[in-house]
A protein has these predicted regions:
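N-terminal glycine-/charge-rich "phosphate-binding" loop or analogous flexible N-terminal tail
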Residues: 1-44, 173
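Short beta->alpha connector loops at strand-helix junctions that form conserved
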Residues: 31, 71-72, 88-99, 194
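Rossmann-like adenosine-cofactor binding region
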Residues: 54-59, 173, 177-220
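Rossmann-fold NAD(P)-binding glycine/threonine-rich loop
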Residues: 76-88
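Phosphate-binding beta-alpha-beta segment of Rossmann-like dinucleotide-binding domains, i.e.
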Residues: 86, 94-148
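Glycine-rich Rossmann-fold phosphate-binding loop(s) that bind the pyrophosphate
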Residues: 154-155
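N-terminal Rossmann-fold NAD(P) dinucleotide-binding loop
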Residues: 158-159
């Protein structure tokens, strides 16, 4: 069996031991990206990828390919419908980065409400030490308690964001096509999209990219 690993540095910054794959056959790794992905896949049985885009036309040039593994949560880099038509299974890692991404969403919120990077730069520039009253105030911090966060997509990542937001004393309005009653409490409830948009102080998008969710938030 031949295994091709595209986007090697992005998939493995160092902690994954690829040598275990050697037990299953020939393993070929590529570190750079090219437009002609089909030439890299070639006669491989299995391909692992992260950012490389694979179209149906690419897959048609790889008749030996039997399995595609997307080492990420999102799999829009692969023409899944085309792969299905050709009988090639496509797998992803649905729980990858769940905690980290929810944490990052809250980190961005704290940056917006406190301008941490700006004030850090000003302190390092010496502004605090040179101020006559040892204090400067360019942006008023926004307290999160009793503010409302709208979460569009209360799945794995949305639930992490919701949990942390509630820990800050925020109320959560959630919009999701699938509603889990176990997630509803005095600080978190489901609602329709228009109500969420009209009543949220901040909105977090945690829904997957499907045709029906593309451009979900627009100028209107």
């Amino acid at each position: 069996m031949k295994i091709v690993i595209l986007d090697h540095p992005r998939e493995n910054p160092g902690e994954i031991d690829w040598s275990r794959f050697d037990e299953y056959g020939e393993v070929v790794r590529y570190s750079d990206r090219v437009e002609d992905v089909a030439s890299r896949i070639g006669d491989a049985d299995v391909v692992f990828l992260n950012k490389s885009k694979v179209t149906k036309a690419d897959l048609e040039k790889c008749p030996n390919l039997k399995f595609i593994s997307v080492i990420a949560t999102g799999y829009n880099t692969v023409d899944v419908d085309g792969a299905r038509e050709l009988g090639i299974p496509v797998a992803n890692v649905p729980s990858y980065g769940t905690e980290a991404i929810g944490q990052h969403a809250i980190a961005l919120l704290l940056e917006i409400t406190n301008h941490i990077a700006y004030h850090d730069a000003e302190v390092r520039r010496g502004r605090k030490n040179n101020d006559t009253d040892w204090c400067f105030w360019d942006y008023s911090p926004i307290e999160l308690e009793n503010k409302t966060m709208g979460i569009i997509g209360l799945g794995r990542i949305g639930q992490i964001t919701s949990r942390v937001a509630q820990a800050f004393g925020m109320k959560v309005l959630a919009y999701d096509s699938f509603q889990n009653p176990a997630l509803v409490n005095e600080n978190c409830r489901y609602t329709d999209l228009d109500t969420l948009l009209a009543n949220s102080d901040v909105i977090a998008l945690h829904c997957p990219l499907f045709p029906e969710t593309e451009n979900l938030i627009n100028k209107a």
